[in-house]
């Protein structure tokens, strides 16, 4: 039976107090406390197994039997309403109403917090905030639930305001903020809060450390990452597998493969994720042969490669032109490990063929893919058309596919425009430029960053936002002058920086 019909049928019972229940039903209720426990136990078991509709039916039968639910009953059901989407919103509202009738939403901190959590997970923050403000007593879990909900939905300012109002901030509060900043792309803020957390005397756990390392990875903040690594060693987190995996990702992203190698070899225990980190990371850094060595060692150690592992192996083959070996790995993945190829695997093969100049093979693969090729796959082949023989005919076909996919990337138009220009077809090049202008496509400005005293300074072309812009320009002019005195020609890029 579906959830909503159950709720619709039993809603009168859900708001019936036990003192007004049917006397005939009440006679069956010989031991209310024991019966409440048994009913709640069944409801909790059903909810934990994802059977929310059956749990709702059980709750309906419980109320019809004249048995009053306790706080554990409400917490179990409210948790289910937050975790499952199909039809649970109406049940959540009814449970909230029933809890209000019993006064549990205001006077029982655990029930009130569960209601807040349910509304937050469903994105109903106005309702969650009303319940929060109405509660007489709040504990740290209540505050943290609101903060976590705000951060999950990207309401960073509201989360920060809630954090500032907290009477006491604990580890979970700080971690929710730091983790939320990372997930929503506020990497620099995450690192600032991580430092503030330590200054405040709260010792980070492995979850907060991983969040900080992820922020360092996304920013390329190697110095701060090294500092976090030293902290990890001093606080005996070095045997935490997840922390070590994050360190490997950080060092590979920053190009420090030797540091990544050291972390990997010092691990007492490794998981598939650990092996994937070095295989993918080394492949991305041009250490393709070593990446494939790790791929073989992984299997020798008894670890079963997964889809991510094969993405790393195929990437490695692509970077060093091992076409036949890459095709062999693709077959091993499908036949030996029964892994259904994803679009990223096909993308690796297209890149493998394209880098080797085998454009016809790459095109045949794209046409035979079981799924619709995306802009990454077609864009890879388009770039290869420029690099291998300036194949304008194929490039035009690929550009039509990208247009059909509604892909509006300036880089694809630039590639085709340059191909026309290289072939002396100036009208075609001009047409591509006009299309770019008509679509409002502009080249995304590149940026560079430098880390000084654990602070990231990011610079973009034409950006004057940095507080030291004037001083930076003066220093850049001095460097350019010295270069000219030494007989060096200042590149256009340097001139652009000065004139930006």
From Swiss-Prot:
Repeat region (PPR), residues: 35-69, 70-106, 108-138, 139-173, 174-204, 205-239, 240-270, 271-305, 306-336, 342-376
Gene3D superfamilies: Tetratricopeptide repeat domain
GO terms for cellular component: chloroplast
Matches recorded under InterPro entries: E_motif, Pentatricopeptide_rpt, PPR_At4g14850-like_plant, TPR-like_helical_dom_sf
Residue ranges, annotated region (Type E motif): 377-453
Family designation: Belongs to the PPR family. PCMP-E subfamily.
Name used for this protein in its record: Pentatricopeptide repeat-containing protein At1g05750, chloroplastic
Encoding gene, per UniProt annotation: PDE247
């Amino acid at each position: 039976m579906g959830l909503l019909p159950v709720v619709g049928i039993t809603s009168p019972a859900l708001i019936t107090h036990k003192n007004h229940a049917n006397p005939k039903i009440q006679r069956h209720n010989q031991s209310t406390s024991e019966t409440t426990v048994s009913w709640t136990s069944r409801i909790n078991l059903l909810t934990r197994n994802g059977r929310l509709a059956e749990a709702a039916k059980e709750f309906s039968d419980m109320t019809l039997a004249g048995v009053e639910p306790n706080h554990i009953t409400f917490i179990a059901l409210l948790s289910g309403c937050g975790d499952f989407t199909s039809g649970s919103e109406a049940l959540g509202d009814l449970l909230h109403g029933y809890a209000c009738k019993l006064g549990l939403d205001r006077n029982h901190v655990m029930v009130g917090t569960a209601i807040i959590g349910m509304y937050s997970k469903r994105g109903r923050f106005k309702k969650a905030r009303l319940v929060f403000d109405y509660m007489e007593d709040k504990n740290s879990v209540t505050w943290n639930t609101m903060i976590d909900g705000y951060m999950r939905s990207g309401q960073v300012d509201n989360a920060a305001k809630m954090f500032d109002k907290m009477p006491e901030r604990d580890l979970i509060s700080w971690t929710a903020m730091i983790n939320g900043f990372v997930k929503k792309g506020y990497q620099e803020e995450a690192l600032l809060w991580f430092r503030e957390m330590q200054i405040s005397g709260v010792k980070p756990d492995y979850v907060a450390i991983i969040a900080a390392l992820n922020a360092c990875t996304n920013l390329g903040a190697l110095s701060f990452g090294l500092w976090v690594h030293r902290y990890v060693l001093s606080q005996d987190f070095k045997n935490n597998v997840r922390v070590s995996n994050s360190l490997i990702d950080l060092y590979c992203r920053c190009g420090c493969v030797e540091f990544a190698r050291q972390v990997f070899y010092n691990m007492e225990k490794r998981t598939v994720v650990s092996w994937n980190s070095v295989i993918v990371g080394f492949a991305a850094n041009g250490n393709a042969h070593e990446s494939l060595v790790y791929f073989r060692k992984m299997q020798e150690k008894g670890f079963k490669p997964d889809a991510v592992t094969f993405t790393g192996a195929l990437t490695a083959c692509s970077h060093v032109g091992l076409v036949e070996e890459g095709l062999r790995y693709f077959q091993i993945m499908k036949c030996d490990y029964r892994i259904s190829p994803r679009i990223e695997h096909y993308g690796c093969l297209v890149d493998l063929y394209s880098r080797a100049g085998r454009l016809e093979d790459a095109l045949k693969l794209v046409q035979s893919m079981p799924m619709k090729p995306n802009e990454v796959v077609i864009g890879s082949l388009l770039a290869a058309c420029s690099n291998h023989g300036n194949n304008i005919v194929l490039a035009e076909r690929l550009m039509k596919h990208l247009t059909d996919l509604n892909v509006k990337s300036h880089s694809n138009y630039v590639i085709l425009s340059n191909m026309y220009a290289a072939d002396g077809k100036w009208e075609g090049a001009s047409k591509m430029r006009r299309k770019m202008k008509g679509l409002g496509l502009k080249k995304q400005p590149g940026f560079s960053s430098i880390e000084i005293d654990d602070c990231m300074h990011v610079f973009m072309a034409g950006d004057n936002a940095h507080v030291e812009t004037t001083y930076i320009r003066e220093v850049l002019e001095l460097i350019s002058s010295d270069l000219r005195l030494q007989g060096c020609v200042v590149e256009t890029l340097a001139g652009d920086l000065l004139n930006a």
